Design a protein with these regions (language model features):
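Extracellular/lumenal ectodomains of secretory-pathway glycoproteins
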Residues: 13, 17-40, 46-52, 56, ...
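Long, charge-dense tracts
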Residues: 65, 69-220
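Active-site SXXK
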Residues: 266-289
C-alpha cells in the first residue's frame, strides 16, 4: 500500500492527494487478517497542521474566504465500530448531525487487514461521505489508519476526491488526530446481523462490460454515455437486467473509488417523485377513481387558475 505505517504514524499532509488505491490492500501483495480486533469508539479531531484543499468548482463562493467552514471537517466526530471478520461496521450509518455549519459525516462499512512488514500494526479503512447541511450534495471520501493492541492508533489519513454536486467540487485530504475508546457496544450483535442480512439481500453484481456477454446485442457503452453526462462528473452508473446489477464502477479524480458498493447517493428529486407516486397509489386504493378527479371540484379557490 502506498500509505506505509511510518507515514501514517508521522501524519504529515502531502502536497497533493494520494491515489484511492492507497486506502486499501495493495494489488499483488498478500494481505492477511488483521492481527488485532477493533471494537469501540473512534473519535476524530482536526489536527494542528493545515489540510489539503483544492477547489474545482465553487459557483456560490462557499470557499472564497481562507477560513470558510467548508474548508474544514467537523471536529470532533465519533463513530462506534463493530468488527465482523474483516468487515468494519459503523453502528451509525446515517448522517451524524453536529455543530458544523456545512458538513455532516456519513460512514460506510470498511475493512481491516494486515500487510507484510506492518509488524504489530493492523490496518483499517472506512468509506465516508460529507453531506451538506440542509442540502443533498454528497462528497465521497475514504479514511485509513493503523492500530495496535492497548488502544494505540495512528493519525487518520483522509481524502475526498468525488462528489454528486454540480455547484461545489473540491479535493480534501490530510490527517485527523484519532483516539480509540474501549466502550461497550450493546447493539453489536444486532449491527452484525443487520449487515449480514443486507449482504444476503443484495443483487448479484457484475461489471457493466459483462452485459454484452450475458445479453448478446446489448451495448454497455450506451450506459453513462459521454454525450449525456461529462465523464469527470460521473459518480456511478449501471443497469439491472434479470435480477443482476451490472455496475459501471465508481470513478474519482484519484482513481476508482475502493468501496463502490458503499457509495452513498443522494435522492434529489427521486424522493419527491416516488413519494408523490406512492401517495397517489395509496389514495387510489382507498378511493378508487381518485386519480382522475379534478382538484378544482374540491377546492373552489383553484377555479381561477384553471
Amino acid at each position: 500500500t502506498e500509505l506505509q505505517v511510518a507515514e501514517l504514524l508521522a501524519g504529515q499532509t502531502p502536497s497533493r492527494p494520494w491515489r484511492m488505491d492507497a486506502f486499501v490492500p495493495a494489488t499483488g501483495v498478500a494481505s492477511t487478517a488483521a492481527g488485532a480486533g477493533i471494537f469501540g469508539r473512534l473519535v476524530l479531531r482536526a489536527g494542528s497542521q493545515p489540510a489539503g484543499f483544492r477547489v474545482l468548482q465553487d459557483t456560490y463562493g462557499a470557499a472564497d474566504a481562507p477560513t470558510a467552514p467548508v474548508r474544514r471537517l467537523p471536529s470532533p466526530v465519533s463513530v462506534d465500530l463493530v468488527q465482523d471478520g474483516n468487515a468494519l461496521i459503523p453502528q451509525t450509518r446515517i448522517p451524524i448531525a453536529g455543530s458544523h455549519p456545512y458538513w455532516e459525516f456519513v460512514f460506510g462499512v470498511g475493512r481491516t487487514w494486515q500487510e507484510p512488514g506492518d509488524g504489530e500494526w493492523s490496518r483499517a479503512a472506512l468509506p465516508f461521505s460529507l453531506m451538506e447541511v440542509n442540502a443533498n450534495c454528497l462528497h465521497h471520501g475514504v479514511l485509513t489508519f493503523v492500530f495496535a493492541p492497548a488502544g494505540r492508533i495512528s493519525p487518520v489519513a483522509y481524502q475526498v476526491s468525488s462528489e454528486t454536486c454540480a455547484y461545489f467540487k473540491a479535493d480534501l485530504w490530510g490527517f485527523l488526530q484519532a483516539e480509540f475508546m474501549d466502550v461497550t457496544t450493546p447493539e453489536a450483535g444486532r449491527v452484525v446481523e443487520a449487515r449480514r442480512a443486507e449482504i444476503d439481500g443484495r443483487l448479484p453484481r457484475r461489471p457493466l462490460a459483462q452485459l454484452a456477454d450475458d445479453h448478446p446485442g446489448s451495448s454497455p457503452a450506451e450506459f453513462g454515455h459521454p454525450a449525456e453526462v461529462t465523464p469527470w462528473q460521473m459518480s456511478t452508473w449501471g443497469v439491472i437486467v434479470d435480477g443482476v446489477h451490472y455496475s459501471g464502477g465508481c470513478p474519482t479524480r484519484a482513481g476508482e473509488y475502493p468501496f463502490c458498493e458503499e457509495l452513498v447517493l443522494p435522492s434529489y428529486s427521486v424522493a419527491k417523485s416516488v413519494f408523490g407516486g406512492l401517495g397517489l397509489m395509496r389514495l387510489e386504493r382507498r378511493f378508487p377513481g381518485a386519480r382522475n378527479q379534478e382538484v378544482v371540484d374540491y377546492v373552489p379557490e383553484c377555479a381561477a387558475h384553471g
